[in-house]
Amino acid sequence: MAKAIALGDVARGRTAPNPNVGCVIVQGGEVVGRGATAPGGRPHAEAVALAEAGARSNKATLYTSLEPCAHVSPRGSPCASLIADAGLARVVAALEDPDPRTAGAGFAILRDGGVEVDVGEGEAEARVSMAGFLTRLALGRPRITLKLALSIDGKIALPSGQSKWITGEDARAHVHLERAHSDMILVGRGTFMADSPSLDVRLPGLEPWSPRRALLSRGDPVEGWEMLRSPQDVFGLHDVNDLLVEGGSATATAFLAADLVDRILIYRAPILVGAGKSSVGYIGLDAIADAHGRWRSEDGRSLGVDRLEVYERVRGA
């Protein structure tokens, strides 16, 4: 299962609105088929793995990070039917698909076809890998990650506005990897006017996976950019699983005040700025007690001279 989830994780940011599924077929202890959801969402991971395995799928075990689909599309039969027809003996899935078009129906097709089904292995890891898709199905909007590059004392720029570069090359390379795993990246009008950002991916081999660009602004449309008039417009992004917000203080504040941020990436540099621009303004909290319990620390590690801190929103808090 770990291999299947890893395959799907590589495809994150390329498959929306479909999930980034990974699949492995094992026959006699040997991996005979591998697949991940293709760019654009089709073909599905299971179909790719079945095509590679061919006749070796018969009586084999298929590991998939998500329940095989059960709905018929113009592009072909549902994956659950393909698996049953291929004669596999067993399917191990990490998660049931929350998409109402499947939602257990894929497992029913498999069982009706004589395929043994086990669910739950690797569930926690699969939820992390497909967090964007799962968030969109649950909340009706993309999973939103806020990226902040800060000094030790929490500043994003000097009083003059100068901010290039607070962090070093390793931290900036990690940001580009996050971009490659996002379907869309957003900045505010202030960042757009000050920096004219390209927001592309500049890592060798990943340049084709630069995300779509969005601008949070009530101004005139800008060619090559998708416009969001307010943070609440994210509920209209039905074809985006993962949204990365890279704007300045005003944009960060707007999304946090609207409680639309699911994950925060803080790239903290070992520098002191003193008087400077703060990362976030007023977000509606008037008591320290109300701030506690809303976020949990998920990760922390060094990136060259800098430090990455990852925080996840605790929903319901």
Task: Explain the meaning of each model-derived region.
Residues 13-15, 42, 107, 121-149:
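Proteins enriched for Cys/Gly/acidic motifs involved in redox and nucleic-acid/cofactor modification
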Residues 25-125, 253-256:
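Zn2+-dependent cytidine deaminase-like catalytic core
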Residues 1-16, 33-34, 52, 57, ...:
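Enzymes that bind and transform nitrogen-containing heteroaromatic metabolites
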Residues 74, 103-106, 130-131, 157-161, ...:
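Short acidic, glycine/serine/threonine-rich loops at helix termini
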Residues 2-5, 111, 127, 131, ...:
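Generic alpha-helical structural signal
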Residues 43, 76-77, 123, 127-131, ...:
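Structural motif corresponding to alpha-helix initiation and N-cap regions
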Residues 22:
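Helix-turn-helix
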